[in-house]
């Protein structure tokens, strides 16, 4: 999965997919009542990027729905996965469940079109703080009470705080999650980070009793760091330059081993060689 980083304006969806992304990451900020409010990152952000592009969250969802609904004039067949980077740092821990409920209702109405031919992309809820694990139960509860528990089949999870792998496993246990797990590891492109924790995550993914289904690394903008991540065995690379990652995947060393995921590739299934 080539994951376009910080896609917060509707116009950027086309831009990143046209550069080669089959997945995008979008920032979600919350108001003081735990309502998802804007797709907005803010300053500071990655080096070489504008940090302040934004939409109202529900408007972004409508644009995203068009981009992922077959038959729509804005449809991109290639765009199959969306990571919502949930900026829950502004919330109290006891608001996490409410944030999950409100997020689910927004998605149900504006993205899934109340279950009636909505957007088809798989969704990853990326949570920065292990203490906010109740967001997951709140999300599930709202979809169930609104009569659409089946949409949970399209939803996966990520804890993005670079926590110890054992602590992450424990948070999922508390959240009652037993699958659909993406594990992120990374740092802003302004700084360097080694691949030690990525290798631990990949080892967990490939073990018989691990909790991880997929591993992605962020934010990778250079050819050499792309190669290093692929050599470590990641499933996804988040990047500001999807064309760079696409170019590396076309190199003979990687062409035989990797391909770009399509809609038919289940993002919740661990890939077995």
Swiss-Prot record:
SUPFAM superfamilies: PLC-like phosphodiesterases. InterPro entries: PLC-like_Pdiesterase_TIM-brl (IPR017946). Binds 1 Mg(2+) ion per subunit. Glycans are attached at residue 250. One of its GO terms (cellular component) is extracellular region. Expressed by the venom gland. This is Dermonecrotic toxin LarSicTox-alphaIB1aii. It comes from Loxosceles arizonica. The lineage of its organism: Eukaryota, Metazoa, Ecdysozoa, Arthropoda, Chelicerata.
């Amino acid at each position: 999965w080539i994951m376009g980083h910080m896609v917060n304006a509707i116009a950027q969806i086309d831009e990143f997919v046209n550069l080669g992304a089959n997945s995008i990451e979008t920032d979600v900020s919350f108001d003081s009542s735990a309502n998802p409010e804007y797709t907005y990152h803010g300053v500071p952000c990655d080096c070489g990027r504008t940090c302040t592009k934004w939409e109202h969250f529900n408007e972004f969802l409508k644009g995203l729905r068009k981009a992922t609904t077959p038959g729509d004039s804005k449809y991109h067949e290639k765009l199959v996965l969306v990571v919502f980077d949930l900026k829950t740092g502004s919330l109290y821990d006891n608001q996490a469940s409410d944030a999950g409920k409100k997020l689910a209702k927004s998605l149900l109405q504006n993205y899934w079109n109340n279950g009636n031919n909505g957007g088809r992309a798989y969704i990853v809820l990326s949570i920065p703080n292990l203490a906010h694990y109740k967001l997951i139960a709140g999300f599930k509860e709202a979809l169930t009470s609104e009569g659409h528990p089946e949409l949970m089949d399209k939803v996966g999870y990520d804890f993005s705080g670079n926590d110890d792998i054992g602590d992450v496993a424990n948070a999922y246990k508390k959240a009652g999650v037993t699958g659909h797990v993406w594990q992120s590891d990374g740092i802003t492109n302004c700084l360097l980070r080694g691949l030690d924790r990525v290798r631990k995550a990949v080892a967990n993914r490939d073990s018989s009793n691990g909790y991880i289904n997929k591993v992605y690394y962020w934010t990778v903008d250079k050819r050499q760091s792309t190669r290093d991540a692929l050599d470590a065995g990641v499933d996804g690379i988040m990047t500001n330059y999807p064309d760079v990652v696409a170019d590396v995947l076309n190199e003979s060393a990687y062409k035989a081993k990797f391909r770009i995921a399509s809609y038919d590739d289940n993002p919740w299934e661990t890939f077995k060689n």
